[in-house]
């Protein structure tokens, strides 16, 4: 039965607020400071977080950062990884690579030192946890519903985070891909209300619309219509950001154009133009655009763009040496040989082998 009295629901909510205030219940931090701020401290009960971006722009990387941080800091969280895009083989290799700094081919094909083997075992042991469940292949909305309902029933007192990577990989059982995506989101909207502390992180792609306008700096900021497939995701999410790495799209000199006084908290990343305009320096930077914030601390001063510096230019790349020219200075007027009149010059061709007689 879906109907419940206001008294019953209010009493439950007041009890939950009391647990947060007393410290009995702790919010789930994502480990990403600007994201925790956007969430007003972290993942609270019923939150739906959307992460959108083009392929290879770091959506899965962010989700892996969040998962790693949650498992390291919150033992009472059950994390469900619906890894519909990357197999567990790839996920584990990526984790090892990120935490050791070694490339995947080096991990796979080079003999490890004793020190490296110790680190490798430590990382693998971190992944041998009972607190993570993997849905290691795409499923239909119906199977997703059944699996999550089962977890909810078996874990009424645990905090649960469900992460989907990514929405477009839903297994289509009937109708179109969009219909299946919508069906899954309808289930998320229902499931978030049937457990006292469950949150959802949903990854999705950007569509091709962005590529059609990215050459114009005035139109380079992502908008909600850039989200692939379904506007239901935008409607459902409490917080949604688009992650973009402009230099991967060939945008190297400047990114966006805006009044120089905008984005005052990002002054270190600006490139100032003529007059009152400025742009962002895109080199080695990842941009986070918060397209939706259902709740904010200060409506007047919303900070909805953040930048992470991935790497910086080498010194040799920052300045380009212009060719130099030196004008000779003479202390006395230079003396040139007497000019020969071309009219009186008669070259001899009697012997081309004699350099004295050569006309060249």
Language model segments and positions:
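Hydrophobic/aromatic beta-strand patches that form the interior of the parallel beta-sheet core
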Residues: 49-51, 78-80, 135, 201, ...
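The Walker A/P-loop phosphate-binding site
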Residues: 2-102, 153, 330, 358-360
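Structural recognition of the conserved hydrophobic beta-strand(s) that form the central parallel beta-sheet
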Residues: 163, 198-205
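Conserved H-loop
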Residues: 82-84, 202-207
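Flexible loop/turn segments at secondary-structure boundaries
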Residues: 57-59, 86-90, 169-172, 208-212, ...
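Cytosolic-facing regulatory segments adjacent to core modules
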Residues: 74-156
């Amino acid at each position: 039965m879906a109907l419940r009295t206001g008294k019953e629901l209010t009493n439950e909510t007041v009890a939950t607020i009391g647990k947060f205030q007393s410290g009995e219940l702790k919010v789930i931090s994502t480990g990403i400071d600007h994201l925790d701020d956007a969430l007003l401290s972290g993942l609270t009960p019923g939150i739906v977080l959307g992460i959108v971006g083009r392929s290879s722009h770091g959506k899965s990387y962010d989700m892996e950062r969040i998962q790693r941080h949650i498992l390291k800091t919150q033992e009472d969280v059950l994390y469900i990884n619906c890894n519909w895009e990357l197999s567990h083989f790839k996920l584990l290799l990526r984790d090892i690579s990120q935490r050791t700094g070694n490339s995947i081919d080096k991990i796979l094909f080079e003999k490890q030192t004793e020190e490296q083997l110790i680190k490798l075992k430590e990382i693998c042991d971190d992944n041998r946890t009972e607190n993570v469940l993997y849905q290691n292949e795409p499923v239909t909305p119906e199977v997703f519903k059944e699996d999550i309902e089962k977890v909810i029933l078996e874990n009424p007192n645990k905090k649960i985070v469900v992460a989907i990577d990514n929405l477009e990989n839903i297994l289509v059982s009937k109708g179109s891909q969009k219909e299946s995506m919508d069906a899954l989101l309808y289930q998320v909207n229902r499931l978030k209300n049937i457990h006292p502390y469950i949150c959802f992180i949903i990854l999705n792609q950007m569509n091709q619309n962005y590529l059609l306008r990215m050459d114009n700096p005035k139109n380079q900021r992502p908008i909600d219509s850039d989200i692939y497939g379904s506007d239901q995701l935008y409607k459902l999410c409490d917080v949604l950001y688009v992650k973009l790495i402009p230099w991967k799209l060939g945008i190297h000199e400047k990114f966006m154009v805006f009044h120089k006084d905008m984005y005052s908290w990002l002054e270190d990343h600006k490139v100032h133009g003529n007059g009152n305009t400025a742009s962002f320096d895109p080199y080695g930077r990842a941009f986070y655009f918060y397209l939706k914030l259902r709740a904010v601390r200060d409506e007047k001063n919303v900070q909805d763009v953040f930048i992470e510096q991935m790497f910086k230019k080498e010194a040799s790349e920052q300045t380009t040496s212009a060719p130099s020219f030196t004008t000779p200075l003479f202390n006395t007027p230079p003396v040139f040989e007497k000019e020969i009149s071309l009219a009186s010059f008669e070259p001899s061709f009697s012997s081309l082998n004699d350099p004295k007689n050569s006309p060249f």
